[in-house]
């Protein structure tokens, strides 16, 4: 199943940035009509080397998606345990406090919007909230302290961090479901042994 996580962009390059500036300079010096139909379509589609409202919305959507997964997973696991007849135990609990997963993901940026300092702070705070929930790989990017002077590397790091958080959450989820399944299998084996079969 495809999700917003599959749309994250973390492979921007300097060449992508250069392409944006090439087309932008062409527009500024010769006008929009100086672009070929292909260049115009490329420019209007939201270029990978630019960071604009579509990128901000994608990050907001990914934040909301991950936060929703984090907050709903405990009840999903509880329902699964109940269905399988497995009692609650700390070994089946998520390694974070779901109540602390509080984000304010903005997903309605439009062309021309400029992030205010408070919106930029909230944008980065969302990343901080999600990042601190799980133990991530040692090379996981840090949350940037500001969006001022944003580079393509920082933009890549923001979206790669979200990818890693989601991947780690998926691994945690799979392990917790597996623990429940192994418990059920162990009970079935024990019952089989003690029933004389």
List PLM regions with ranges:
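Extracellular "spike/adhesin" assembly and maturation modules
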Residues: 1-197
């Amino acid at each position: 199943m495809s999700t917003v996580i599959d749309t994250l962009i973390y492979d921007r390059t300097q060449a992508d940035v250069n392409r944006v500036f090439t087309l932008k300079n062409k527009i500024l010096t010769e006008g929009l009509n100086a672009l070929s139909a292909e260049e115009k379509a490329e420019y209007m589609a939201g270029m990978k080397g630019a960071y604009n409202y579509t990128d901000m919305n994608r990050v907001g959507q990914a934040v909301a998606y991950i936060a929703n997964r984090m907050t709903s997973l405990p009840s999903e696991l509880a329902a699964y345990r109940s269905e399988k007849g497995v009692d609650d135990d700390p070994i089946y609990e998520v390694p974070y406090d779901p109540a602390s997963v509080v984000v304010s993901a903005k997903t309605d940026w439009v062309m021309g919007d400029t992030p205010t300092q408070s919106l930029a702070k909230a944008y980065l705070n969302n990343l901080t909230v999600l990042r601190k929930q799980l133990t991530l790989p040692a090379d996981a990017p840090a949350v940037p302290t500001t969006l001022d002077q944003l580079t393509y590397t920082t933009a890549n790091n923001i979206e790669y961090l979200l990818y890693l958080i989601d991947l780690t959450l998926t691994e945690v989820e799979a392990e917790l479901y597996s623990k429940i399944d192994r418990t059920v299998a162990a009970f079935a084996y024990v019952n089989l042994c003690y029933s004389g079969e």
